[in-house]
């Protein structure tokens, strides 16, 4: 935790050198942020508290209708396993269907709406939505709720106050399960998501993704 401000400063000051990996389609970035624009300058910045549904809408995470479709094995091949495409309705063009990944038969779909309700329920509706977004072409989604408490770094020195967040994230390609973490990192891109997950000592997960 003590190294967090220096690491975050490096990310924000040198962000132009790193890929944010936010999903962007038709000039629209799937990202929303409360009051503060992120270093990449993408997405929607809002100034008033939003409901869970409103947050999903702002970040282009609503109505994906994530679903499975059987992947047929070519007739000249044999396999004792069944695989499926993970599909979604494109968030900016509902006439288009996107492939998010290929998973095994034990994979269970989670809608973005269910992920965000999961986070909302952890705090019993007591948090405020801070950021939300989609990265890696929709394969990974995240949301962060601001908590009331603050962490004080170096209380006998500079006494910096660092906000904390409840981070929720999952994948739609079977790469990671549903996770909930408490972190001082304000997640706005792939880099800050990785930083939050790598510096969080304890993560609560729901085993959802099976290849």
Which role fits each region the language model picked out?
Residues 4-9:
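Short, positively charged and aromatic/hydrophobic N-terminal segments
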Residues 11-118:
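Feature for intrinsically disordered/low-complexity regulatory segments and propeptides
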Residues 113, 117-211:
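Intrinsic disorder/low-complexity polar-acidic segments
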